[in-house]
Amino acid sequence: KPGMPKSLPCSAASNADPKSYATQPVETILTNIIGNKNILDYCVSHKEITKMILTSSFEVYGELNGQDIYSENMSGMIDQTILRNGYPESKRCCELLVRSYVEEFGINAVIARLPSVYGPTMLRSDSKAHAQFIRNALNGENIILKSKGDQRRTYCYVVDAASAIFKILSAGKNGEIYNISNEKSVASIAEVAKMCAEIAGTTVVFDLPDEIEEKGFSRSKNCILDNTKLRKLGWNGKFTLRDGLTETLAYLKDE
């Protein structure tokens, strides 16, 4: 495609679900940091690599008291005494490592901060709340909510996420960070549960989390990503949250 670099490594492999954060904290941290370093070293030694991208996470923002909308220059507190925070801390380290390689070795790299991405390609073992809601809905079961669900999040259908990543690769400025966010897909966890139940014709019920589930919970209240920088590159999301959830369930039912 015109405008796209020829060789495009993408640093994306990671434990990316709360259960893994709680039960495999060492693997989560090392996969992020060492895996990312290996890709960066490859970029340095292979001059045909024209650009690489790191897929980071909204979790790097930590807790920003009094802030609901997060732009790329913000940074909040992450409690290092909580094991599940090995994920956001290691993602922060990866971001700094990428920018350091850009400065010291002159590679061309960009960073994408992803929101809560969903779609039919999610792992069946994914323990994130919205992934569990989708599995419940797919099986015709009641949607189980294990908290008040009042935290508001930015969600993104996988098709929109993929197109945003390609836009950042093709048009993003070297060393810059870009939030991936679709303003049509902002909702509370409870609203996502209700939407899944409505699409599937089931009901939302409340249950207590078990010990491992509770250890994996994020402590941040609201996290709505500001997509101003990404929109300036010419990108806009196509899918509303309801449309994306409907497509996800329809696709999985046809498998």
At which residue positions do the language-model features occur?
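C-terminal substrate-binding subdomain of Rossmann-fold SDR/epimerase-dehydratase oxidoreductases
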Residues: 137-255
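A short acidic, helix-capping loop that chelates divalent metal ions and anchors anionic groups
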Residues: 18-22, 119-120, 213-215
